[in-house]
Regions:
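Condensing-enzyme catalytic core of the thiolase-fold
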Residues: 1-237
Length: 237
């Protein structure tokens, strides 16, 4: 879904269209996906997505849909449209050669986030919250945490670690719709200035050194970090 959002933004910036709808949908109408993922040992046996937690034991499938309507900011303002947020920049890349779909490349992930920040023209330290991919797997979560830290936390104070969460702990992994659901959650965080808890985070994963990475996972609703400018969130997928 975020690939569609990225491509829509590119078309809008190039003047190829005046507005665009982008998103994704997942409907589980056959058991095939469950069978395949189960045979691969990828699904959580207890049906709970415990992203970045010690109890992370696999991902949880979910179904749903999400769509956003995109327009250039100047045109949306001129038309008097309600504006839920502004996409400052985005990027798209490929994982490259890895040992499998459940073992993503940390270097590629970090480069993607760095490129997105560069496209947005922002200092990564200005990001007050990141909505992570956070599938709840014991191997994938530490890889993503490392990548996000390398991309966003190099100049961040250890006393102010970056909050991150995963909507998959609420809804499961919506697969082709997962990215846009994370984007919508990020927009709601901006709108209300509140960061919700990431569920099922009873204890941090022993494979993630949160202090060293300068990251943290909120376990209760909290206010968005104070900023001297506009609120900014990042979405990784």
């Amino acid at each position: 879904a975020l690939t569609a959002v990225h491509m829509a933004c590119e078309q809008l910036r190039q003047g190829r269209c005046e507005m665009a709808m982008a998103g994704g949908v997942t409907v589980m109408i056959t058991p095939d996906g469950f069978i395949g993922f189960s045979q691969a040992g990828m699904l959580s046996p207890d049906g709970r997505c415990a992203a970045f937690a010690a109890s992370a034991n696999g991902f949880v499938r979910g179904e749903g849909a999400g769509i956003v309507l995109l327009k250039p900011l100047t045109q949306a303002l001129a038309d008097g449209n309600p504006i839920h947020g502004v996409i400052l920049g985005s990027s798209l890349n490929q994982d490259g050669h890895t040992n499998g779909i459940s073992l993503p490349c940390p270097e590629a992930q970090a480069r993607l986030v760095v490129d997105a920040c560069a496209d947005a023209g922002i200092d990564p330290v200005k990001i007050g919250y990141v909505e992570a991919h956070g599938t709840g797997t014991a191997v994938g979560d530490p890889i993503e945490a490392t990548a996000l830290s390398h991309a966003l936390c190099g100049d961040r104070s250890p006393e102010a670690p970056l909050p991150m969460g995963s909507v998959k702990s609420n809804l499961g992994h919506l697969e082709t719709a997962a990215g846009v659901v994370g984007l919508i959650k990020g927009l709601l965080v901006l709108k209300y200035g509140q960061i919700p808890a990431s569920l099922h985070f009873d204890a941090p994963s022993e494979h993630i050194d949160f202090a060293a990475l300068k990251l943290r996972v909120p376990t209760a609703m909290e206010s968005f970090p104070k900023t001297d400018g506009q609120r900014m969130v990042g979405v990784n997928s």
